[in-house]
Design a protein with these regions (language model features):
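Gly/Ser/Thr-rich phosphate-binding loop
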Residues: 104-157
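Conserved pre-ATP/AMP-binding loop-to-beta segment of ANL
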Residues: 1-6, 37-43
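Conserved adenylation A10 loop of the ANL superfamily
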Residues: 4-17, 144-145
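Active-site glycine-centered loops adjacent to acidic/histidine catalytic or metal-binding residues
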Residues: 10, 118, 142, 192, ...
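AMP-binding/adenylate-forming
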Residues: 18-34, 43-101, 138
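Conserved beta-loop-beta connector loops within the AMP-binding
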Residues: 162, 166-189, 197-199
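Conserved S/T- and glycine-rich ATP-binding loop of Class I adenylate-forming
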Residues: 7-10, 44, 56, 92, ...
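AMP-binding/adenylate-forming catalytic core of the ANL superfamily
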Residues: 186, 191-227
Length: 227
């Protein structure tokens, strides 16, 4: 069985990507192994849609892999997040666009873990989120094509990305090639440009193609020019 997703890729043309359900299960199990202790006893709530791979993996497949309850309703506003019952503890699956609009005047809910992906989370928004919820966000890096690649937990600005177990990155002439159990054995070349340190961790330094990200959405400059 497959789930079909669409992404702009590096060309700007919509590209259909068929994700085997078994691959989504495997990705969720990788995440469960990595985060299980910190997610113990949490309920999942989210401000991201499950129509995208990030929302599908973290909002649906991950809590299922851990046997944890998930909140079906979307959280669109800070007020909905603040209104969550204090009877439970929550894992909040969110995005930079939502976190930068948090209302710090509201009463914070008992969030045990914040996950953010889909785009870069500016440092000032990391600090703001931590100030309100008293916890630092876990940032996730990946793509629809590759699945999860890396994560970081920033308590200061310049923290690099760390790859997940079984994910390997190789600098080649055409770009950085990723090898992962979630994709074909020959690997995939990333659209992003990475700068590695001596320990194999990395920073994101830009993109190769004419596709930019604005509030977690891939925007094709080619498509805009053709309109």
């Amino acid at each position: 069985a497959f789930i079909e997703l669409f992404t702009s890729g590096s060309t700007g043309q919509p590209k259909q990507i068929a994700k085997p359900v078994i691959s989504l299960d495997q990705e969720a199990n990788m995440l469960a192994t990595h985060f299980a202790d910190r997610l113990l006893g949490c309920r999942f709530v989210a401000s991201v849609m499950p129509q995208h791979l990030y929302g599908l993996t973290f909002r649906i497949f991950l809590p299922m892999a851990l046997g944890l309850p998930l909140h079906a309703a979307m959280l669109w506003y800070s007020e909905q997040l603040a209104a969550l019952s204090h009877t439970y503890r929550y894992a909040f699956v969110s995005s930079p666009a939502f976190l930068k609009r948090l209302d710090l005047h509201l009463t914070p809910p008992p969030v045990e873990m914040i996950l953010s992906a889909g785009g870069m989370l500016p440092w000032q928004d990391v600090e703001k989120t931590s100030t309100w919820l008293n916890i630092w966000p876990d940032e996730i890096y990946g793509s629809t094509e590759t699945g999860i690649l890396a994560w970081r937990y920033r308590q200061q600005d310049n923290i690099p990305w760390f790859t997940f177990s079984d994910v390997h990155l190789s600098q080649e002439s055409e770009g950085v090639r990723v090898f992962s159990p979630l994709i074909p054995a020959e690997g995939l070349v990333l659209d992003d440009m990475l700068q590695f340190n001596e320990n194999g961790q990395f920073h994101l330094i830009g993109r190769r193609g004419r596709v930019v990200k604005i509030e977690e959405k891939r925007i094709s400059l080619v498509e805009i020019e053709q309109r």
